Amino acid sequence: MNYLVMISLALLFMIGVESARDGYIAQPNNCVYHCIPLSPGCDKLCRENGATSGKCSFLAGSGLACWCVALPDNVPIKIIGQKCTR
């Protein structure tokens, strides 16, 4: 039984774990992508970056911005509390 657990853990580490998170997709300078409600722009942008879906949502301090669901870790998201540096 212990061997089965050890082999399972070894396979998990060898294969790797892909994680995803939800958030406002951001440009490299921590600026959000602005959007128009009910337009397909956010969903398209999010899906192009590996998310499962996206929508236009309100973010205090930034206005309307694209919110992505299940965005990969390698895609930047808005860091709340940090300013957009243009």
From Swiss-Prot:
Disulfide bonds join 31-84, 35-56, 42-66, 46-68. The keyword Chloroplast does not apply. It is found in: Secreted. Its main location: secreted. Residues 1-19 form the signal peptide. The C-terminal basic residue is removed by a carboxypeptidase. GO terms for biological process: defense response. It comes from the Eukaryota. GO terms for molecular function: sodium channel inhibitor activity; toxin activity. Has the structural arrangement of an alpha-helix connected to antiparallel beta-sheets by disulfide bonds (CS-alpha/beta). Alpha toxins bind voltage-independently at site-3 of sodium channels (Nav) and inhibit the inactivation of the activated channels, thereby blocking neuronal transmission. This is Toxin Aam3.
